[in-house]
Amino acid sequence: MKALVIGAGGVGSAIANIASRRPFITSMVIADRSLSRAQAAVTKVNDPRFSAQEVDASDVNDIRALIRKAAPDIVVNAVDPRFVMPIFLACEEEKVNYMDMAMSLSTPHPTDPMNKPGVKLGDEQFARADTWSKNGNYAVVGMGIEPGMSDVFARYAEDELFSRIDYLAVMDGSNLTVDGYDFAPSFSIWTTIEECLNPPLIFEEGRGWYTTEPFSKLETYDFPDGIGPVECVNVEHEEVVLIPMKVKAKEVRFKYGLGAQFIETLKTIHTLGLDKKEKISVQGVEVSPRDLLAALLPDPATLGDKMHGKTCAGTLVKGLGKDGNPKAVYIYNVVDNEWSMKNYGNQAVVWQTAINPLIAMELIANGTWKPAGINGPEWFPAQPFLDLISEYGSSWHIREEEPKGIVK
């Protein structure tokens, strides 16, 4: 498979590192607005299958030109969600296959944003499904860790473990710390703000999708593998859009284990207006407060050797098991930063994200997954994906939970 990866930040660089160990990749172009950053990712893998290019991910025509030059089987979007639509549209126009790890951005409801959704995550992409089907190409959207592996867990739960799903919550948490920083997100601050400060999206059977105030439904969840209890809140996330489209569940939500200090910091950022995307004039210079904040914080790709701890992504499912009795499980994946740095030179959060598009690409390349049109991870059988996780050096587990309050 010939791949073009757009974005040479933490996730894009990790994709290159992992892909260099997989023979199904015949060639991979790593492209970035900074040619030197793309070249650094290629130099690190030291593999003749890999090359670097420069591209402006906000410019559809520039992306189209690179697609024509690289002639890939698939384009992998490894930049933040602002650039989903330019890359997606460039692939549509060039009739080339596409994969991303985050979907097109949402827009709040114009008059009632804390109760009703406006434009949901991914709506812009799914609105073009007929065109993709007509073109004979595929787009696999939301194929990172969350969304991505978490959606695969949801599909597995329905197929193998449950006869009825009452409650499904993707639960993300970690005990990661960064030396020398009180506040240093391990992922793009632009994306973190977008997820955490937008009204959270929730799905309920019979009601459909609705929204709440940011940071709603605070609960402390005890994460596995020594991570322990972390304060979790509702957050807007793609799984809440994708999972109800293919998995029958009475309730779906995403809860992010941010921790009390992180939550308070984000609230302060919002209070000060530093989360705003729109540019303002500062002494004659036009600048976006969110872009300024991102420039002030450390690049997550550079934090690996300063990070300690583990990160966990998983799906909590409650309902009736295949035997008709109450059942609750947490299906999860944990990555230790010490392990990912030692074996790949990538910090845990970006490595955990990067393996998933590659597993999906391998399943497509060998004909196990057969995407057509626009697809999410839960469109496909889960077991082949889960079987490949161990080949990529990671693992997945099922923890039985107390099935409290589940009525037959």
Residue ranges and their predicted role:
Residues 3-9:
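Conserved N-terminal Rossmann-fold NAD(P)-binding element of oxidoreductases
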Residues 33-37:
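Helix N-cap at the beta1-alpha1 junction of Rossmann-like dinucleotide-binding domains, i.e.
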Residues 45-59:
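Rossmann-fold cofactor-recognition segment
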Residues 101-137:
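Rossmann-fold NAD(P)-binding glycine/threonine-rich loop
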Residues 67, 73-77, 91, 98-100:
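N-terminal Rossmann-like NAD(P) cofactor-binding module of classical short-chain dehydrogenase/reductase
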Residues 56-72, 79, 83-86:
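Conserved Rossmann-fold cofactor-binding substructure of NAD(P)-dependent oxidoreductases
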Residues 12-13:
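N-terminal Rossmann-fold NAD(P) dinucleotide-binding loop
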Residues 159-408:
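C-terminal catalytic/substrate-binding lobe primarily of soluble NAD(P)-dependent oxidoreductases
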